[in-house]
Regions:
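Amphipathic alpha-helical assembly/interaction segments
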Residues: 1-103
């Protein structure tokens, strides 16, 4: 698979991940803790797709590395909020199946 196909495939996968997160939190949570942590998870998780898309439009190698660095930080934050939500029993792990975002 060439680089362009991989980029398009990863764009589609990160977008699907963002859509799943939006659907998971489409119904307003009943308690404040879930609402706050869920909002953080929603924000960082959906920005993954946007930041990856932006990295595909990089104008130079340095620009690409910079954009991927932001993406890496957002991915780590998304994982953090996912762990917090799951370990606090605020969401079920099934909502966010990590297999959907594996490289």
């Amino acid at each position: 698979m060439n680089t362009l196909n991989r980029a398009k495939q990863l764009q589609a996968r990160t977008k699907r991940f963002a859509v799943r997160i939006i659907k998971a939190f489409a119904r307003p949570p009943k308690d404040e803790a879930t609402r706050i942590a869920g909002r953080q998870f929603l924000r960082s998780g959906t920005s993954l797709a946007a930041n990856y898309r932006a990295s595909c439009r990089a104008r130079s190698t340095a620009d690409f590395i910079s954009k991927i660095s932001v993406l890496t930080e957002e991915a780590d934050e998304t994982l953090f909020w996912c762990e917090v939500l799951v370990e606090s029993d605020l969401i079920r792990l099934k909502i966010v199946e990590i297999s959907d975002v594996r490289m």
